[in-house]
C-alpha cells in the first residue's frame, strides 16, 4: 500500500511517503501561498505517487488544539479525495523532534526540510 503523510502548517506543508510499508522518505515541502493552491499541489502530489492512504498530523492537547484541528480538517476537505483513505495521527512534538534530529546536519532554513521530517515522524508513528 502506498502511504503519504502531511504536516500542515500555515506557511508550508511537510510531506513524506512510504511505498513499501517499511521505509518512510521525506519529500520536498509544499509552499503554501493560499489554501486553494496548497490543496491543489497536495492533491497533485498524491495522484502522482498513486497514494492509497493519507495520514494527516493533528495536534492533540495544547491551547491551540481545537482551532488547528478545525483548520486541518477543513484543509483536508478541500483535497476532495475520493479514492484515498484519510487517517489522523497525533503530531505532538514532531516539529521539535525533527529539529533535534537535524541539529548540525543542515541549517534551519525556511525551506521546509523540518516540516517534511516532521511528516516523516508522523508516518513512522502511524506505521
Regions found by a protein language model. Give the residues of each.
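Phosphate- and other anionic-substrate recognition elements at nucleic-acid/protein interfaces
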Residues: 2-3, 10-127
Amino acid at each position: 500500500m502506498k502511504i503519504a503523510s502531511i504536516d500542515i502548517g500555515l506557511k508550508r506543508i511537510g510531506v513524506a511517503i512510504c511505498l513499501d510499508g517499511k521505509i518512510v522518505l521525506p519529500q520536498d515541502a509544499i509552499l503554501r501561498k493560499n489554501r486553494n493552491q496548497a490543496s491543489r499541489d497536495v492533491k497533485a502530489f498524491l495522484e502522482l505517487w498513486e497514494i492509497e492512504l493519507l495520514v494527516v498530523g493533528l495536534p492533540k492537547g495544547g491551547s491551540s488544539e481545537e482551532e488547528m484541528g478545525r483548520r486541518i480538517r477543513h484543509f483536508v476537505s478541500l483535497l476532495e479525495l475520493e479514492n484515498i483513505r484519510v487517517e489522523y495521527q497525533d503530531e505532538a512534538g514532531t516539529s521539535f523532534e525533527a529539529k533535534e534530529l537535524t541539529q548540525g546536519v543542515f541549517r534551519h532554513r525556511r525551506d521546509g526540510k523540518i516540516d517534511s521530517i516532521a511528516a516523516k515522524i508522523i508516518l513512522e508513528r502511524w506505521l
